[in-house]
A protein has these predicted regions:
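Positively charged n-region of N-terminal signal peptides that target proteins for export
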Residues: 1-4, 464-465
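Sec-dependent signal peptide recognition
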Residues: 3-11, 450-454
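Compositionally biased regions
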Residues: 6-7, 17-21, 442-445, 449
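Hydrophobic h-region of N-terminal signal peptides that target proteins for export
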Residues: 12-20, 459-462
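Signature for phosphate-centric chemistry
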Residues: 20-159, 163-442
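Cleavable C-terminal sorting propeptides in eukaryotic secreted/cell-surface proteins
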Residues: 443-465
């Protein structure tokens, strides 16, 4: 009888372990959950809060490019996430009726409570968390750069640019209200620019379309690591056959949106992934953006040229003590706009390109969207006048409020002469007048040539979306 009782206890322990999932998921109280979700990472989880004034230097000019704050899913993403309601029921049925699957019990309970609650009218608009991110960013910027931002507030002293897209405009308004007060619309009106969410004029460019259609990200989805991930997730959820890749990505979208929208939450769908799987999905997203908006396509750097040229023009004017220029410029745009601007400024460039086959070798990659392009991501250039050292004029760059240290600078503090020389090609009259697309492979034999100089107005509009 005693032996039978022992066997029953062992059986119960085994069943309990099966339901708890062992190492197949992290517990909600995990002291170190993996929360880096590529370009949909919550800003509050990654920004650098340790700002130190530059000794013997005073800021005289600030320029910032700011991505819109945390937003709700767009229409297509919302449709995909809503389909998880039926899928959720299948997962629960697998565990409770068919006794298949290996999810943690608390994750299964959390999954039962999960609901997708986003009003269709709010889709792709800034969220309350996004508004708070903008307010906090404005306060910190105002505190750090008080010497620049305490000047008389008017449209000549400060410039704010944003597209008319809701989430971008609302981000700019939240930031400006905190920075300049409730009357900012009269004192420092936001200059609206044409909304444009695509590379108009570049969609027929083979160099760009080939990078998208033949993306390394598509090949990565066929890699052994990726296929094994899909297989393991399917088994964990109790399916005898692999679930579709679209379901995996809907789960991932729900996970990262929920975390970004409610920072203190433990999203139900996040618990369905292991730490290693979240890292693999992060790499997939980074790889996708590397070829869409990154160094994987040569044309992307050219698209960012107009904004980089504008920035260098401002810095040059400050160096020449030109009084006919603003004290600060704030630009609000899209993820793609921020990234193509960073490309033009050689930020987050890896010595070895990201590919579908070097995932493990790219663990410490610079092109990590969670650190470069999270929600509310930003890049700033601050011009300093210094009393000591061999040069009065210095420039420091900040990526998500952390010092960005260009090689050749002193812990991030760069001499203006160094920056001027590094980006001299943006200071000439034809800084963006370069051929960026030539097609000699079409059957028609017609060459397609796109010149950035002809697309500068379009590129500027695109970069501000």
């Amino acid at each position: 009888m005693k032996g039978l009782s022992s066997r029953i206890l062992l059986l119960l322990a085994f069943l309990s372990a099966s339901l708890s999932g062992g190492d197949s998921c992290y517990e909600p109280m995990d002291p170190d959950p993996y929360l880096y979700f590529s370009h949909k990472t919550a800003y509050q989880l990654i920004f650098n809060s340790k700002f130190k004034p530059v000794p013997y230097c005073r800021p005289t000019f600030v320029w910032m490019f700011i991505r819109s704050g945390t937003s709700y899913p767009n229409t297509n993403e919302s449709l995909a996430i809503r389909q998880l309601h039926q899928f959720k029921d299948r997962v629960i049925k697998n565990h409770e009726e068919r006794r298949n699957g290996n999810l943690c019990k608390n994750v299964l309970d959390s999954l039962k409570r999960w609901e997708f609650e986003v009003n269709p009218t709010s889709e792709d608009d800034i969220s309350p968390q996004g508004r708070m991110d903008m307010q906090l960013l404005a306060r910190r910027t105002k505190d750090k750069m008080s010497e620049v931002l305490v000047k008389e507030i008017n449209k000549n002293t400060f410039k704010i640019y944003a597209s008319e897209e809701r989430k971008v405009m609302n981000s700019a308004e939240e930031f400006s209200k905190t920075m300049f007060g409730d009357n900012f619309k009269y004192n420092v009106p936001i200059e609206k620019v044409q909304s444009n969410s695509s590379f108009i004029g570049l969609e027929s460019c083979p160099k760009w379309t080939d990078a998208i259609q033949n993306s390394e990200a598509s090949l990565f989805r066929k890699s052994p690591e990726y296929m094994e991930m899909v297989s393991q997730i399917s088994k964990r959820l109790g399916f005898l056959e692999n679930i579709t890749d679209s379901i995996v990505h809907a789960m991932y979208e729900s996970c990262r949106y929920n975390k970004a929208l409610v920072i203190e939450s433990y999203p139900a769908w996040c618990g369905l992934f292991t730490r290693q799987e979240l890292q693999l999905l992060e790499y997939y997203e980074d790889l996708d953006y590397y070829y869409k908006y990154g160094y994987g396509s040569e044309i992307n750097t050219k698209v960012g040229c107009p904004i980089a040229k504008e920035l260098m023009g401002y810095l040059s004017a400050v160096a020449k003590n030109d009084s006919d220029r603003p004290s600060a410029v704030f630009r609000f745009g899209s993820s793609a706009g921020l990234l193509t601007t960073l490309l033009a400024l050689d930020v987050a460039k890896d010595p070895v390109p990201l590919t579908h086959y070097n995932y493990h070798a790219q663990y410490r990659r610079q092109w990590r969207m969670s650190q470069v392009d999270p929600f509310s991501g930003n890049f700033a250039a601050v011009f300093y006048k210094c009393d000591q050292g061999d040069e009065e004029n210095k420039v420091m760059f900040y990526l998500n409020e952390g010092v960005y240290d260009y090689p050749g600078c002193n812990v991030g503090l760069c001499s203006w002469k160094f920056i001027e020389n590094k980006f001299r090609h943006y200071l000439g009259p034809n800084g963006c007048d370069e051929e960026v697309c030539r097609d000699q492979s079409r059957a028609s034999g017609v060459r397609s040539v796109v010149w950035v100089v002809a697309l500068i107005p379009i590129a500027l509009a695109y970069l501000r979306v």
